[in-house]
């Protein structure tokens, strides 16, 4: 499902006869024109099949899969984040950077190494390099930029270990920041973005390669290293470094660059790339820099949690019932392995299943579990009878958590022991209490009292107890308070006073994004679609491989295998960056103001984000999470410190020893969280999950034995269980039990039954249009000053102020100014005494 290319328009689905979207092409991704053939494309048939098999191991025997020791965080380890910046094709450029630095360095310092100089000498040379960026000759400027990049990379030629490289890298980057390198690079980047000659040359080229983006890649590399390193807080940092970090974060989020935050410039690069005007832009580096810029300026998930607690205190709301980050970290997803008797029983059931007669059932009860998006892996047998009995012989990861045997011994950590009982405190909204009271009053008394939640006269004692329990667990969200305040501002614009909008980084960023936010969302989703492993390349799809393909295509089997790994890794990093950017923006906007979040979320929905994420998960997700698309000996900084061994097919296939790929699991969790954000409390969007038949796709994702990922999958299943029919619920009791155990409860939510279906007709357009009207009113009131009602605008009564205003006069008036003076001023008598009184 491709993101909408034109302006936003609601996705209209017929309520009576839901039609799934047309199935996209098979999930075997083909590179765009000019791209290399797939990994192993030059291999003999058997070898290619074996290589591909090692790349994506089949996860059908998932009962043997171990628990994934994965801890979710804002980013991966620093070394891993640095390594993912460079593609393996860029390897030879490390030595080129070193050569450019040493040629210039030897002119000024002949007898010492960089690591032997003192701080003043370092600063002097850094400023000298900075001056070199101002030359007009492109080649000279590029050489100086490469020399600066070598300094930012830790002057690795003088280091003997990876730790030493990282030490000097951190020192050098704070030095470069101190002399003002980042601002100079922003100006150069702006110049390169507007370089029309490079853009028109790239548009005309049939196949774009690494060479077309050299200048941009060097600049983006330095900027990424600065942002990523300064953002990392280390215990041994000097006091001045900590001060510089705070100043840098503030500047990065302020509208200092063309009167807009730096992130807006990067968003502009993304849209320019997607429009086809700049196909040479190195999109992976742009997206990584965009992600780290947003993370650095707005803050990560733990910072967000503390900001949320502060805001609740400010609004006079009670504290959060628990710290969700800690609760999720303490959740377990392990399960006992399948016993031999279970396996025999499963085989017998499969044998019996073949002789079952087909039973005609109601549409949703039968709920055909075949996907609208058919992937290549062999899942027909699994989907023919999608009930939990088909998983009996497998180690279903959510079954009987409390009787789980102890996991393998690991080093002691500071994790809290998980308390007995349910992990989450239940929540109740004010609206839920009102609905409960209304139904109770109409049932027992025969009349209603509107939104009165205190009067319980005439209601039986058990109802009193129920209301007391509901009120004990009442939870008022920040979003509800913000929506109520917005209603007040609109209801009484004069008496309500002027709203004080705090210029926090999220507010500044939203103001910058607001004019073109729909285009930014469409562009990000287009790139996500092109990078998804289930996508098939089309002639009109964008080429995201411009900064990974070499000038000359591989000629040997080994080069082809290396490039295949590089291309897959490149796509995975892009998915990781986009998913992280979208999630961070959604969470920060939701905290800053609910209608900022709703504006972004609605444009994601209009651009088909929901089916796109479902399409992403319609693959062998266990294979995606355990994919080994990395060559550890070629990762930075390992490749610049150690002598490179001779690459062989075996060393390429070996990958690392991790049981999962951190970036892929991180991406999957982010995408599930985005899907949760988009559908939460939105009936029409929940029905989209049902219409797109997401249940079987999500159920397969439960095979990944990681607690956080399972939690968000179960949340998505919970919101749609009431619409899947009784038969589905009956045959998926283990999933229902898992939802009960893992997901937060709403005390009067009838999620497991579906008794209120008749009262909730599905009208996508009406719901989205009502929400859109609220969003537009909010944006117009707060940001659209030009179209405000003139009666409500303040009036300037000061004579000096009015006379001091500059008025633009039309040209014809200026030419005939003498005539106007004669007719309107000199020819009319003026009573100066009256005028001056």
UniProtKB/Swiss-Prot annotation:
Keyword Cytoplasm: yes
A GO BP annotation: regulation of cell morphogenesis
Annotated localization: Cytoplasm
Phosphoserine PTM sites in chain numbering: 59, 335, 339, 788
An annotated Gene Ontology molecular function: small GTPase binding
The keyword Iron is assigned to this record: no
Residue ranges with Acidic residues bias: 378-391
A GO cellular component entry from the record: nucleus
Top-rank lineage group of the source organism: Eukaryota
Family: Belongs to the STRIP family.
The protein's assembly and partners: Part of the core of STRIPAK complexes composed of PP2A catalytic and scaffolding subunits, the striatins (PP2A regulatory subunits), the striatin-associated proteins MOB4, STRIP1 and STRIP2, PDCD10 and members of the STE20 kinases, such as STK24 and STK26. The STRIPAK complex can be extended by adapter proteins such as SLMAP:SIKE1, CTTNBP2 or CTTNBP2NL. Interacts with CDC42BPB. Interacts with CTTNBP2NL.
The name this protein goes by in its record: Striatin-interacting protein 1
Source organism of the structure: Mus musculus (Mouse)
């Amino acid at each position: 499902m491709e993101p909408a290319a034109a302006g936003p328009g609601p996705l209209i689905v017929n309520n009576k006869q839901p039609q799934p979207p047309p199935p996209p092409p098979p999930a075997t991704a083909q590179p765009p024109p000019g791209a290399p053939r797939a990994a192993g494309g030059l291999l003999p048939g058997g070898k290619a099949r074996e290589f591909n098999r090692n790349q994506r191991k089949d996860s059908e025997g998932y009962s043997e899969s171990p628990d994934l020791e994965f801890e979710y965080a804002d980013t991966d380890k620093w070394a891993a984040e640095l390594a993912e910046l460079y593609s393996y094709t860029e390897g030879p450029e490390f030595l080129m950077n070193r050569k450019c630095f040493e040629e210039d360095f030897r002119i000024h310092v002949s007898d010492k190494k960089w690591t032997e100089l003192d701080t003043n000498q370092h600063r002097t040379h850094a400023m000298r390099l900075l001056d070199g960026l101002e030359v007009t000759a492109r080649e000279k400027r590029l050489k100086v930029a490469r020399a600066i990049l070598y300094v930012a990379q830790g002057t690795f030629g003088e280091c003997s270990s990876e730790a030493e490289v990282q030490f000097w890298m951190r020192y050098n980057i704070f030095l470069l920041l101190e002399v003002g390198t980042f601002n100079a690079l922003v100006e150069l980047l702006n110049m390169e973005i507007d370089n029309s000659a490079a853009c028109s040359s790239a548009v005309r080229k049939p196949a774009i390669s690494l060479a077309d983006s050299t200048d941009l890649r060097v600049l983006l590399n330095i900027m990424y290293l600065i942002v990523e390193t300064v953002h990392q807080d280390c215990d041994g940092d000097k006091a001045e470094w900590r001060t510089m970090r705070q100043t840098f974060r503030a500047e990065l989020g302020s509208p200092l660059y063309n009167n807009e935050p730096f992130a807006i410039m990067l968003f502009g690069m993304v849209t320019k790339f997607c429009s086809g005007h700049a196909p040479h832009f190195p999109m992976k580096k742009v997206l990584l820099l965009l992600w780290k810029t947003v993370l650095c300026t707005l803050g990560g998930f733990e910072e967000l949690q503390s900001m949320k607690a502060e805001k609740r205190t400010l609004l006079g709301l009670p504290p959060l019932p628990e710290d969700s980050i800690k609760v999720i970290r303490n959740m377990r997803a392990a399960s006992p392995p399948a016993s031999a008797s279970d396996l025999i029983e499963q085989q017998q059931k499969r044998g019996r299943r073949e002789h079952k007669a087909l039973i005609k059932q109601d549409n949703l009860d039968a709920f055909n579990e075949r996907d609208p998006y058919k992937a290549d892996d062999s899942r027909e047998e699994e989907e023919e009878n999608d009930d939990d009995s088909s998983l009996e012989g497998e180690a279903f990861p959510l079954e009987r958590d409390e009787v789980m045997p102890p996991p393998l011994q690991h080093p002691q950590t500071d994790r809290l022991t998980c308390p007995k009982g349910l992990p989450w405190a239940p929540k109740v909204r004010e609206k839920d209490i009102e609905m409960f009271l209304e139904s109770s009053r109409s049932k027992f008394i025969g009349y209603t009292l509107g939104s009165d939640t205190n009067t319980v006269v005439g209601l039986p004692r058990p109802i009193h107890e129920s209301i007391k329990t509901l009120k004990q667990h009442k939870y008022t969200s920040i979003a509800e308070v913000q929506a109520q305040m917005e209603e007040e501002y609109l209801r009484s614009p004069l008496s309500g006073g002027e709203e004080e909008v705090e210029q926090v980084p999220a507010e500044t960023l939203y103001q910058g994004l607001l004019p073109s936010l729909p285009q930014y969302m469409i562009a990000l989703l287009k790139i996500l679609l092109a990078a998804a492993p289930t996508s098939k390349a089309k002639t009109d799809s964008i080429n995201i491989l411009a900064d990974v393909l070499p000038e000359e295509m591989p000629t040997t089997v080994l080069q082809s295998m290396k490039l295949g790994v590089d291309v897959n890794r490149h796509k995975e990093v892009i998915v990781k960056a986009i998913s992280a950017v979208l999630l961070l923006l959604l969470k920060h906007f939701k905290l800053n103001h609910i209608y900022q979040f709703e504006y972004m979320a609605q444009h994601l929905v209009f651009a088909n984000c929901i089916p796109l994420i479902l399409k992403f998960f319609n693959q062998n997700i266990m294979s995606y999470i355990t994919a080994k698309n990395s060559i550890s000996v070629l990762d930075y900084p390992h490749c610049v410190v150690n002598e490179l061994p001779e690459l062989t097919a075996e060393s390429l296939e070996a990958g690392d020893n991790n049981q999962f790929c951190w970036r892929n699991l991180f991406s999957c969790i982010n995408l599930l969280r985005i899907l949760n954000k988009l559908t939460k409390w939105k009936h029409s969007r929940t029905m989209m999950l049902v219409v797109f038949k997401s249940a079987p796709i999500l159920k397969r994702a439960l095979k990944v034995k990681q607690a956080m990922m399972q939690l968000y999958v179960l949340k998505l299943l919970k919101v749609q269980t009431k619409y899947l029919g009784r038969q589905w619920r009956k045959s998926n009791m283990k999933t229902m039990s898992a939802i009960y155990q893992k997901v937060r409860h709403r005390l009067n939510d009838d999620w497991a039954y579906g008794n209120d279906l008749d009262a909730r007709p599905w009208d996508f357009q009406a719901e989205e249009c009502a929400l859109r009207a609220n969003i537009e009113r909010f944006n117009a009131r707060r940001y659209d000053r030009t179209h405000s009602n003139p009666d409500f605008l303040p009036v300037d009564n000061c004579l000096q102020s009015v006379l001091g205003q500059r008025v633009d006069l039309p040209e014809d008036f200026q030419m005939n100014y003498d005539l106007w003076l004669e007719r309107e001023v000199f020819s009319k008598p003026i009573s100066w005494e009256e005028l001056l009184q």
